[in-house]
Amino acid sequence: MNTKNFTPQESRTNAQQVRQQNQQSAQGTSSGFATEFASETNAQQVRQQNQQSAQANRMSGATAGGFNTEFASETNVQQVRQQNQQSEAKKRNNQQ
């Protein structure tokens, strides 16, 4: 087993280096995540996509948003009316 005693200058941890790294880390902590997030988000591209989406919604006649448009596009109104009429007819027949 190696039991060599280290002098302060030979210590395994370089205190000055640790202080410097901590300082650099602290400086980056306040804005590091925000900077990374901003660098991965192309604001111009997002604006362009939002504009295209808004134009598409205006062209399709959407009033309140995408969900209403999607719901309406997947609902066959004529089929629903027909089913409602059949249901009402069955109710009338059952009441007689």
Curated annotation (Swiss-Prot):
Segments for region (Disordered): 1-96
Sequence repeats: 28-52, 61-87
Compositional bias of kind Polar residues: 1-15, 28-41
Keyword Oxidoreductase: no
Domain of life: Bacteria
Site (Cleavage): E36, F37, E70, F71
Biased composition (Low complexity): 16-27, 42-57, 76-86
Alphabetical keyword list: Repeat, Sporulation
Gene Ontology biological-process entries: sporulation resulting in formation of a cellular spore
Function, in words: SASP are proteins degraded in the first minutes of spore germination and provide amino acids for both new protein synthesis and metabolism. These proteins may be involved in dormant spore's high resistance to UV light.
Similarity comment: family membership: Belongs to the gamma-type SASP family.
NCBIfam families: SASP_gamma (TIGR01442)
The name this protein goes by in its record: Small, acid-soluble spore protein gamma-type
Source species of the chain: Laceyella sacchari
